[in-house]
């Protein structure tokens, strides 16, 4: 991530002769519609399984959470608790859970993630907190969850989201 909070993404593709080329080299700003205390960078995505060879071109109308079978590659930065107003919910594309702790939500996806910087707590049903450190991986199977950072430094994780059917389980 650079000083402006943007993430550089290099995407490859194929030219007309089938040779590998740089299809995109871009800086991605955080999404404006992330959860309170979260900077969400949608780095890359597809709404259907990729087929090769392709140009590496990306759809310009991607939403943060994929449809069934779609994929997203993203980075999340979780700010320290002291910097966050968890009551100021602004989560787009998520199913918030009434009566649960602020920010608790489900997504119609399997989220495969790895913490790359800092420490973060994954909140689950019943107040369960799972402490994650750099190198720790998680698989979020469409379950009710939220994120907290009890330290004084931002935490970062990268995540691959795979769109799934979700029948409303909390």
What are these regions (language model features)?
Residues 77-79, 105-122, 163:
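Short, conserved beta-strand element in jelly-roll/cupin
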């Amino acid at each position: 991530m650079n000083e402006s909070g943007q993430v550089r993404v290099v995407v490859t593709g194929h030219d007309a002769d089938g040779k590998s080329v740089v299809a995109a080299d871009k800086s991605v700003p955080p999404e404006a519609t992330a959860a309170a205390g979260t900077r969400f960078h949608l780095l890359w995505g597809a709404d259907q399984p990729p087929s090769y060879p392709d140009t590496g071109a990306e759809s310009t109308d991607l939403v943060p959470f994929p449809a069934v079978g779609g994929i997203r590659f993203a980075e999340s930065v979780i700010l320290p608790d002291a910097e966050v107003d968890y009551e100021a919910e602004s989560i787009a594309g998520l199913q918030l859970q009434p009566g649960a702790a602020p920010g608790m939500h489900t997504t119609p996806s399997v989220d495969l993630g790895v913490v790359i910087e800092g420490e973060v707590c994954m909140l689950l049903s019943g107040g369960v907190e799972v402490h994650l450190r750099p190198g720790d991986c998680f698989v979020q199977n469409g379950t009710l969850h939220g994120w907290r950072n009890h330290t004084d430094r931002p935490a970062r994780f990268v995540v691959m989201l795979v769109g799934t059917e979700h029948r409303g389980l909390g």
